[in-house]
Amino acid sequence: SVTKYTDNTANGGGSTASYVTATTDYFFLLSEFEVFGSITYGNTNEKNKQAQYAYYSAGNSKIKYKHNGTSTAALWWLRSPIASTCATFVFVDTAGTVNINIANYSLGFAPGFCV
């Protein structure tokens, strides 16, 4: 298992350090900071408990492709909620840049896991 820190409690309450709490996971979505190395939309305090994955800090592409159309880029969810709004989360768009959307949209995901 791995301990992941995320704003799990704010519900749109803003960037407050106490809102960033731990979960123990085996299978998880990546956070905005773990992918981009910066925070544009999420709780800025998440970065104090996270690190950017070496794969992304090395400059590798953040673009993911659909399983049923491998030349078609896909939108994919991250686990970071928007600090200022409830029910809205960060995702990666088809250009590989950070974006936001309401959580009831069906987007892809590129999970991490721990064995």
Which residues does each PLM region occupy?
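Collagenous Gly-X-Y triple-helix signature in extracellular proteins
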Residues: 1-115
